[in-house]
Amino acid sequence: KCIVHGAGGTLLQHLKEHLLHTDLHRDDRLFYFTTCGWMMWNWLVSGLASGATLVLYDGSPTHPDPEALWRLAGEERITVFGTSPRYLAGLAKAGARPRDRIALPALRTILSTGSPLAAESFDYVYDAVKADVQLCSISGGTDIVACFALGNPLLPVRRGELQCAGLGMA
């Protein structure tokens, strides 16, 4: 899509989403499996304004095996991990259980966007990845390079649901 965005308003929007909706701060390590052609790249890079450290990955998310990104998360002490519903569903289908082999003590939030996150994927994450993590299904748009609905660290996570509308977006 050939869309031009301004920098100032986008950065302010992302700061709101990072600081208030994701509880991102200076000591965090933010990762989102994305290409620089997807709006999530802009969202990821804006994490620098919160003082977070970015973790980048170039390559297949399932090479040399389906748990490659979770090993990265453990080794790099990622605190906020972003991915897609398709990736999580693929892991479940492959029978991957990162929880059994990979320590993820720093991980506190998993974000998922790109399509709706199925209720079964919530079950999979809490059973096979990490039980004490905030799983946020988020929804936004390339045209606004922001989120319409996303997580809230003050609200409970409900299987198959988005937690809340973005502040100022309803």
Language model: regions and residue ranges:
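Conserved AMP-binding/adenylate-forming core of the ANL superfamily
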Residues: 4-8
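Active-site beta-alpha turn of Rossmann-fold NAD(P)-dependent dehydrogenases/reductases
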Residues: 34
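Gly/Ser/Thr-rich phosphate-binding loop
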Residues: 49-52, 79-82, 92-159
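Short Gly/Pro-enriched turn/cap motifs at secondary-structure boundaries
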Residues: 159-166
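Alpha-helix/helix-capping structural signal
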Residues: 86-89
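Conserved AMP-binding/adenylation subdomain of ANL enzymes
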Residues: 9-29, 39-79, 94
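Conserved adenylation A10 loop of the ANL superfamily
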Residues: 1-3, 18
